[in-house]
Structure formats: structure tokens, C-alpha cells
């Protein structure tokens, strides 16, 4: 029989840098999970993605054990990395902070495809291009 699920915890943690400090410690502590066990396992799984923020969904079971699924980094993080910028524009309609080519947007869309609610890579590319525009990044053909 399957284990009884006590709850889910969704976090965004820098790859390879999970520590028992907030936000990880308090979020897992209230469910009674072994925080160090999670941190070690997460850091091992995400060591290759250093520098990126990794969303993780932790499933906590009634016996206080856990399992977790890592997702692809948020589109905004991937766009900032591709454009080599610190943050998006505060006024995206007026101030443009960078330019990105459609090919680069397509590569990001292909990387994000498993986590996006899109039927095709073209649809995913449009989603990522929209995110770029809302950050003040100009998408050039």
C-alpha cells in the first residue's frame, strides 16, 4: 500500500546550496522532516546546475519520510543568464535592458518543455518570448 501523504512543500532553492537556514529549515521543520537529510540529497542532485535557482516539490509522508522532484529553473532565471543581466527592467514598456535572439529563446523553451503547459516547442517559445518582453528584454528575430 502507498504511504499516506501528509503534505507538499514547494520551494525555490539555489542549486547545490540548500542549508537548514530559512527558507528550507522552517518549511520542512513544521512537517517534522529530517532537514539535513533533505539538504544533503538536494545538494547532491543539483550540484551540476550551480548558479541556477531550482524549484523543488517535496512530498512529506505521514511517517515523516519525504521524496522530492526537482523542476527546471524558472524562465526568468534562464533569460537573465542568457542575457548576462542581474535583473529585469522596472519599467519593461519604457526601459529595455537587453536583447535576445529567437534561437536563444527557442533553446530555453526546449529546456523548459517538461515543465511548461505547452503542446509544442513553438507554443513554448511564444511563452518564453512573452516572459522576456515582460522583463524588458527585446526579442529579435
Curated annotation (Swiss-Prot):
Give one Pfam hit by family name.
Ribosomal_L11_N
- Give the domain of life: Bacteria
Its PTM note reads: One or more lysine residues are methylated.
Any GO molecular function: large ribosomal subunit rRNA binding
One GO BP: translation
CDD domains xref list: Ribosomal_L11 (cd00349)
GO cellular component, alphabetical, reads:
cytosolic large ribosomal subunit
Q: Which UniProt keywords apply?
A: Methylation, Ribonucleoprotein, Ribosomal protein, RNA-binding, rRNA-binding
Membership in a protein family: Belongs to the universal ribosomal protein uL11 family.
Q: How does it assemble?
A: Part of the ribosomal stalk of the 50S ribosomal subunit. Interacts with L10 and the large rRNA to form the base of the stalk. L10 forms an elongated spine to which L12 dimers bind in a sequential fashion forming a multimeric L10(L12)X complex.
Summarize the protein's role: Forms part of the ribosomal stalk which helps the ribosome interact with GTP-bound translation factors.
What is the protein named? Large ribosomal subunit protein uL11
Amino acid at each position: 500500500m502507498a504511504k499516506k501523504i501528509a503534505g507538499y512543500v514547494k520551494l525555490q532553492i539555489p542549486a547545490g546550496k540548500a542549508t537548514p537556514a530559512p527558507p528550507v529549515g522552517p518549511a520542512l521543520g513544521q512537517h517534522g522532516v529530517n532537514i539535513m537529510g533533505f539538504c544533503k540529497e538536494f545538494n547532491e542532485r543539483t550540484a551540476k546546475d550551480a548558479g541556477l535557482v531550482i524549484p523543488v516539490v517535496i512530498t512529506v509522508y505521514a511517517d515523516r519520510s519525504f521524496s522530492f522532484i526537482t523542476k527546471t529553473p524558472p524562465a526568468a532565471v534562464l533569460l537573465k543568464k542568457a542575457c548576462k543581466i542581474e535583473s529585469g527592467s522596472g519599467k519593461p514598456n519604457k526601459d529595455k535592458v537587453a536583447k535576445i535572439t529567437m534561437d536563444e529563446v527557442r533553446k530555453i523553451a526546449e529546456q523548459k518543455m517538461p515543465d511548461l503547459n505547452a503542446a509544442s516547442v513553438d507554443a513554448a517559445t511564444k511563452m518564453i518570448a512573452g516572459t522576456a518582453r515582460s522583463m524588458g528584454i527585446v526579442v529579435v528575430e
